[in-house]
Amino acid sequence: MGRLDVAAAKRAYRKAEEVGDRREQARWANNVGDILKNHGEYVDALKWFRIDYDISVKYLPGKDLLPTCQSLGEIYLRLENFEEALIYQKKHLQLAEEANDTVEKQRACTQLGRTYHEMFLKSEDDCEAIQSAKKYFKKAMELAQILKEKPPPGESSGFLEEYINAHNNIGMLDLDLDNPEAARTILKKGLQICDEEEVREYDAARSRLHHNLGNVFMALRSWDEAKKHIEMDINICHKINHVQGEAKGYINLAELHNKTQKYIDALLCYGKASSLAKSMQDESALVEQIEHNTKIVKKSMKVMEELREEELMLKKLSAEMTDAKGTSEERKSMLQVNACLGSLIDKSSMVFAWLKHLQYSKRKKKISDELCDKEKLSDAFMIVGESYQNLRNFRKSLKWFIRSYEGHEAIGNLEGQALAKINIGNGLDCIGEWTGALQAYEEGYRIALKANLPSIQLSALEDIHYIHMMRFGNAQKASELKETIQNLKESEHAEKAECSTQDECSETDSEGHANVSNDRPNACSSPQTPNSLRSERLADLDEANDDVPLISFLQPGKRLFKRKQVSGKQDADTDQTKKDFSVVADSQQTVAGRKRIRVILSDDESETEYELGCPKDSSHKVLRQNEEVSEESMYFDGAINYTDNRAIQDNVEEGSCSYTPLHPIKVAPNVSNCRSLSNNIAVETTGRRKKGSQCDVGDSNGTSCKTGAALVNFHAYSKTEDRKIKIEIENEHIALDSCSHDDESVKVELTCLYYLQLPDDEKSKGLLPIIHHLEYGGRVLKPLELYAILRDSSENVVIEASVDGWVHKRLMKLYMDCCQSLSEKPSMKLLKKLYISEVEDDINVSECELQDISAAPLLCALHVHNIAMLDLSHNMLGNGTMEKLKQLFASSSQMYGALTLDLHCNRFGPTALFQICECPVLFTRLEVLNVSRNRLTDACGSYLSTIVKNCRALYSLNVEHCSLTSRTIQKVANALDSKSGLSQLCIGYNNPVSGSSIQNLLAKLATLSSFAELSMNGIKLSSQVVDSLYALVKTPSLSKLLVGSSGIGTDGAIKVTESLCYQKEETVKLDLSCCGLASSFFIKLNQDVTLTSSILEFNVGGNPITEEGISALGELLRNPCSNIKVLILSKCHLKLAGLLCIIQALSDNKNLEELNLSDNAKIEDETVFGQPVKERSVMVEQEHGTCKSVTSMDKEQELCETNMECDDLEVADSEDEQIEEGTATSSSLSLPRKNHIVKELSTALSMANQLKILDLSNNGFSVEALETLYMSWSSSSSRTGIAQRHVKEETVHFYVEGKMCCGVKSCCRKD
């Protein structure tokens, strides 16, 4: 809908005006308005629609007013002027009824339904609007069905789209009325109609159905299904150039990521949505809402960080509670744990982490029971019910709400009874028991009235109003209730105003509750909870406060509007419904951390220890500062802890309000003994800022100044004669993540922190220590032993790090200088990457969370540094970085020498390649270019062809997953000539690509003398293309062909394999995964073993292999002529018998080293004896292949933490759902048979001596079975002493020392 269309329509309008043709004049005015409307220019569109309307009213008959009324109603709706929209839409309907025009009546009813629906979404309590929307949508559906079955004469469309859109609108309405199951049914029916009627794949009607199904499955917590439908919606809108719909799709996807705590992904989606929204002229409301939602996500990230801190606090307090058993401090410790759990419950609800919420609520229930406090226990029952309610397990939520009511009734707590009754009503409403729900709400109202609790009365009345209006359709009763609700609100506001006037001078009364938050989710999004829970930490921290009465203030419930934050897509996209995400309250920073890290430099001549430059015997106290903690910081998630110090603990215990920040004790520091903190550098470990350092008030033995979350301060620097650094680790979380794989990451982290804290004069030398080994208790630690030491120790741990020399890291020094000059915080991830770099000219900063701004210091440093390889992959870099790279290479004195640029998985657009075209020095230097997984689109076609044509040194090009089509592939083919040095080309996963463009490309590649590797995975190849492929694969130089998921079939695969291996002197790599291969393919390979004599790596995963094919494959592996070194058979439906056959065949095989047999035996069908492996996790021990089981936590907690995003995952109810130990998940095989299979597998595995990597993931093996298999793996003579394993949940990797079983992304693997 470009400017040319508008100009042409305006010319036609002026021409009609000149000749006086009023009908044509009105038609063209409407046409101009429609073009402008679709372009997002609503104000200008309104002007032209008004011209159309004025002409039609003055000069044309009544029937000609129908289209102009419809257009005006539509544009006013998009401008959110509902009053004007309704005027013209009702006039449209009136005219249609007068003319007895069924088509126009259907359109008018649809528009009226949409307008009333939008009014409902924008209003606070407009139940009449939703009823009107329901009436008009149902009428539109009936009319659409009539038109579909009996279309009017002369109408050829059949009104299929209108009928499908009617299903969409009804489904959207059901969703907004909290009927997601009904919505799913009708929306699925709409998709079914699309399929039956063969509606185009990329059709707007499908887009709207997928959009709303995404919302439905989000409401049902079916995250995978929701994502699938949302991505389909986005894809369709992108294909049909529906910018507004694509933006709304990205908003939906962002909401999904936010609800599953994937905040980085959510921000990325909002960024895309914002770019799309800003491209439309009059969508400022949409842009503002996206910006608002982005802020909410950032607040959620902060809350999640706080939650993780408080988890550490809980761990510490739980340990203290255990230690205090049987002492006078026991109850006090229990109250502190209870208060901490309350805070965790609040924060988990803020970020929709309902599985965690359930975990904490059950622990709160348990500890409330131990406290013998019936009120706290009844409140805890209510919180457990809230968890189940939000996890959509309504039967269980009802059970706990009823128990809460019974508990509060037993102690005569009226507020608790009222809230429990309201929550019971919510649960009954969710399962369709509307009469029971109404009775529960009315009972809750009577109790609240009796207890004189106006806020709870209001909440109950609103729920009663909801039931009468929306469930029973009793408009008269609903109207009476609305008046009662309004009167109650007015009286409550008056009372609050009076109270605030009386209390405005009461400083002491308000101080204790100054920071009590009333931002707990209300009844519209989660069950009601007593306000006593919000102030619980006040009561819990002092036993004297145990009997504090419940606070009566409660936010009124709004169950009716709990879906309002979700925008639906209607039959024609009209406006962007603002999503009122629950604003995450800025909660007080709660600090945590059981242990902390201190690095102590020892001096041979003195035993004085320096902690932050403070002598051990000093007695000064340093002010505490607030801290922001990174959720991904490896070592410093628990930065400071109020309870680390007895004096502070006492203040917390004795104070009347733990929400009021403690005032720091101001004591003048001993300046002669403490160095200034002004030179400290805060390390931005995850792109967020860290503030200052933290020093705790000392204990009775002297002051212990401690570092904050992001800092380890070195105020004394010396290279001691024994070249050792003493490390006292006080926080087990510090090193657990780093050392869970090996101890090298621990060494690297400590080294980088050491360097950061050096004085400037030492730092300027760029010298960093090389930590040779870590020692503990006089012995050298073996790999991963630090993990066990930290886990098992209840006290501080002192580790000695032996320094084995010093290494000069020039680029690190340059980077730090540029950070200082640009006022940017250094990135810890980037520093670690630079430190471990072995080749100075090879710069690998992949996965450092770099953005254009944070990458600037590195690019600045590279101006005075030579580059042979630059890896910026897996970051968030955009075209701005590419422009700086062009300037970097253009200004560099390095005019010659090979250059590798790895830029995959970023945010580069098509013009990023333009920067390469504008840099002549790259024409001579660039040898490897990887820009895969960037949204380049066909707009980069001319740039890409220029690069291929002019970069004569280029031998490797990767443009996979770049949204390219035939046009770009054809341009690349045209740019190739016989002089090109291209050797490797990856174009996979780009669609659609036509057969002719692929054939042209293959023909050009066949003329290249040195072409060796081609990847076309994910591109569907026709039989004609396969024929063209034979000529290329016969070329002697070709050594790697990847055509997975290409659909070439068995015959094509046989011909390709024959051609590829034809007279090949060198080995080749072949990927035929997911190609629909039949058993005849494997039989052919077995019959002509020369076909596989040249294959080094062979991927046939994803092809279902029958018993006949398995036998042939087994025979092939036994043949000594087979040279296959790597074989992938994942997802081949081998089953246990097939696994056994393949492994048994390896006893005589001398070549196969890597075998992937994952996803072949379904867990539900063939779980081998004992518990499934996912119920326990096993930690890898690298000492002689032994394995140490990690102590399992409580079953509830373990299941809760397994996956916060699993659909329908719930924690076992400890009281009525005991988990059975040692039961198998299936009985499809008898136990003796299962034991026999494992025994045979073990025997075969011990004889497969050549094998070095074996992947058995997702095959349903139990812990006992895997233990048996691993014993056989490690007992093999070729693997004795070097056997390793990685077993966690369903991941099962057996390997040998020196091999990497996993960890490298598929897109980053280099041959």
UniProtKB/Swiss-Prot annotation:
The gene is TSK. GO terms for biological process: cell division; double-strand break repair via homologous recombination; epigenetic regulation of gene expression; G2/M transition of mitotic cell cycle; meristem structural organization; regulation of meristem structural organization; replication fork processing; response to DNA damage checkpoint signaling. Keywords: Chromatin regulator, Chromosome, Coiled coil, DNA damage, DNA repair, Leucine-rich repeat, Nucleus, Repeat, TPR repeat. Induction: Under cell cycle-dependent control with a peak of expression at the S phase. The keyword ATP-binding does not apply. It holds the Pfam family LRR_6. Disruption phenotype: Abnormal enlargement of the shoot apical meristem associated with a disrupted cellular and subcellular organization. Release of transcriptional gene silencing of heterochromatic genes, and ectopic gene expression and organogenesis. Under-expression of FLC and early flowering in short days. Residues 297-333, 475-504 form a coiled coil. One of its GO terms (cellular component) is chromosome. Preferentially expressed in the shoot apex than in the leaves and stems. Expressed in the shoot apex and root tips in 5-day-old seedlings. At the shoot apex it is expressed in young leaves and in broad areas between two cotyledons. Weakly or not expressed in vascular tissues except vascular tissue near the shoot apical meristem. In the root, it extends from the root apical meristem to the elongation zone. Histone reader involved in homologous recombination-mediated repair of double-strand breaks (DSBs) at stalled or collapsed replication forks. Specifically recognizes and binds histone H3.1 lacking methylation at 'Lys-27' (H3K27me1). Involved in structural and functional stabilization of chromatin; represents a link between response to DNA damage and epigenetic gene silencing. Required for cell arrangement in root and shoot apical meristems. May be involved, when interacting with TSA1, in the organization of spindle microtubules. Residues 515-533 have a biased composition (Polar residues). It is found in: Nucleus, Nucleoplasm; Chromosome. GO terms for molecular function: histone binding. Belongs to the Tonsoku family. LRR repeats lie at residues 810-832, 839-860, 866-886, 898-918, 925-946, 953-976, 981-1002. This is Protein TONSOKU. Residues 492-533 are annotated as: Disordered. Gene3D superfamilies: Ribonuclease Inhibitor (3.80.10.10), Tetratricopeptide repeat domain (1.25.40.10). Interacts (via TPR repeats) with TSA1 (via C-terminal domain). PANTHER family: PROTEIN TONSOKU. The keyword Glycosyltransferase does not apply. TPR repeats lie at residues 26-59, 66-99, 106-147, 164-197, 207-240, 247-280, 378-411, 418-451.
